[in-house]
Amino acid sequence: MLSQLFSSCFLGMKTPLQAQQNCSFPQRRTFSVEDNKIRIYTPEVEDTVKLLVASDTHLWMSDERENDFQKFSKRMSDAYHVTRHYDTKEDTNPEKAFLETISKASNLKVDAIALLGDIFSYPSEAAIEWAAKNLNDSGIPYYYVCGNHDWHYEGMPGPLKDLRQKWINNRLLKMFHGNDPMKYFVDLKGMRLLFIDNSTYEISYEQLMFLQQQIETKKPLIVMMHIPLYATGRNVGFGCAHPDWKSSNDHSFELEKREPWPRDGHSPVTFKFREEIINAPNVLAVFAGHIHKQSLDVMKGVPQFVTQYNACGAFYDVVIIPQRAISVK
């Protein structure tokens, strides 16, 4: 059954499943996954694009500038000192993993590195400066979007949206190269990458409008964000537009010392955002992190790839490859 579904949606073969699935793509595309290697084949691009996608490094380094904030950063600064390498199974740590990832990107000769949030366990000036320097020294273009930890000082009073804006402006702007941290796009060889901040689990009206405008361009799109979209059967870790995302299911707000999720769950805008993505004919894929485990879901023909956490060295090696359209009579 699974193989039939994939051939129906991605290769254009006519099967009875087409009556049950939304497979009406204007172009035919397919993909393959082997370990951390993802290959997307589509006639919608004319040149090969190579990406390294990483998320959740959880860099925690601090210096004397952190002294006044230690009560807000203590829990996360005590975490991820030693991790287990995803491949060698040997002990490693976030700094080693991050440097190794940059080296891998260089060896793979990627066109860009996409960093999908929680690169930092809290907005540490030392960690942000260290990461930015190593990325800049590599000479590889890199693009970043925030996760829920990058800007969060646990226990600091205030609404999450206000705290996010404050600490992005005060600490993280150097990671964005002048782009709008909430939403921006990057064009690579005719393909467009969309970076959208959903680190509060919610989407703003401005972000929804941005997405709709990008879909209207008809350019081939890849959506990059931290928190995965809800997929059928997934838990609230896949929290962007999850129907069970609400205060009654928020079991971490006391641990993370933040506001609980809203009692009534997501806004209609967030649900609309998900629907726009999975129904868009020109969205090739979604990439996300957050849950620290590798996963794949396909929603109305749109694959969502979630990467394992980079604190253990994991990343996705992604190649988008031109493919001549398949003619089906």
Give residue spans per PLM region.
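N-terminal export signals
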Residues: 1-14
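N-terminal active-site segment of His-dependent metallophosphoesterases
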Residues: 19-125
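Extended active-site neighborhood of metal-dependent phosphoesterases/phosphodiesterases
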Residues: 32-45, 125-222, 246-248, 255-256, ...
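Residue-level marker for buried hydrophobic side chains located in beta-strands
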Residues: 51-53, 115, 144, 223, ...
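Active-site glycine-centered loops adjacent to acidic/histidine catalytic or metal-binding residues
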Residues: 56, 118, 147-148, 226, ...
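Charged, glycine/proline-rich intrinsically disordered loops and linkers
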Residues: 66-88, 161-172, 239-263
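Surface-exposed cleft-lining segments at the edges of enzyme active sites
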Residues: 87, 117-120, 191-202, 260-261
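His/acidic metal-ligating clusters that form di-metal
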Residues: 93, 98-112, 192, 201-300
